[in-house]
């Protein structure tokens, strides 16, 4: 049983036990185009769509301002119709702080990668969270510097092969990965901290809810909110495009455990999230064994 939520693969060898539900396709109006310039199999467009859907669902489109980091996702500016400011590498949280303090009613968020946030700008996001700034930071974490061709970042997991860790990340030589969500959750100024993924449809749906809740936290002025989104990067991982989701689940997903790390004042440990994910995966597998999924 996979420890990743919705990890088990649906049984396609037998007829389904219940009829399929037709879901009306929905394309966020914020999306300016159906095209982007990212690699095939990249997970970042799904993360961008989750942000767009959350903003539209909450009616925050007109107040949204994005402080954009440096990375592959910088194409966000050409594909989503929101006001934005392009920031120096790692400095988006500080720029977002300035925007929020000058325009308190704006829905201010950052969009950054793991190289931008955790390597180049770790002090920026930690101090912003510690101050309890009423803004939202969104991290798209694929465990590599995608723009440079797949070099190790601070979030790369042990054993992960990158351009500069050909034999795999070694703790003795390269140090341990930084679990940024767990770090931020322990800061008093952080009100909501979650980690999602886009490696399957269920994960995308849960991640969109996390982004929505983060924006709601900001609108209530409860403090800093943070959502980490694990994304695929088959190009930077040097694997076939179709293997991206499974690779994410078996590498990043087994270390950067998904779930709500801090909500309603309660901090949840990695061990607690892992146990909950195992339980949910077992329940799902049991439902599949009984002949179908329950609502």
Stretches with model-predicted labels:
Residues 70-72, 142-144, 200, 229-236:
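Glycine-rich beta-alpha junction loops
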């Amino acid at each position: 049983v996979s420890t990743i939520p919705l990890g088990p693969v649906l049984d396609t060898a037998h007829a389904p036990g219940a009829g399929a539900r037709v879901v009306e396709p929905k394309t966020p109006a914020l999306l300016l185009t159906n095209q982007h310039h990212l690699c095939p199999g990249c997970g970042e467009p799904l993360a961008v769509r989750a942000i767009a859907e959350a903003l539209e669902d909450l009616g925050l489109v007109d107040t949204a301002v994005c402080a954009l980091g440096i990375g592959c996702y910088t194409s966000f500016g050409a594909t989503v119709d929101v006001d934005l400011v392009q920031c120096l590498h790692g400095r988006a949280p500080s720029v977002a702080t300035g925007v929020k303090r000058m325009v308190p009613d704006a829905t201010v968020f950052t969009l950054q990668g793991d190289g931008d946030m955790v390597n180049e700008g770790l002090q920026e996001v930690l101090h912003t969270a510690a101050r309890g700034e009423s803004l939202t930071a969104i991290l798209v974490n694929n465990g590599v510097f995608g723009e440079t061709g797949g070099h190790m970042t601070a979030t790369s997991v042990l054993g992960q092969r990158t351009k500069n860790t050909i034999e795999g990340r070694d703790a003795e030589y390269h140090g341990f990965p930084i679990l940024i969500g767990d770090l931020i959750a322990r800061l008093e100024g952080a009100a909501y901290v979650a980690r999602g993924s886009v490696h399957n449809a269920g994960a995308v749906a849960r991640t969109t809810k996390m982004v929505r809740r983060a924006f709601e936290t900001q609108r209530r002025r409860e403090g800093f909110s943070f959502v980490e989104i694990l994304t695929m990067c088959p190009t930077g991982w040097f694997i076939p495009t179709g293997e991206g989701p499974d690779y994410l689940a078996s590498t990043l997903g087994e270390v950067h455990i998904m779930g709500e790390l801090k909500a309603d004042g309660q901090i949840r440990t990695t061990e607690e999230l892992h146990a909950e994910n195992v339980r949910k995966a077992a329940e799902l597998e049991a439902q599949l064994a009984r002949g179908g999924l329950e609502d």
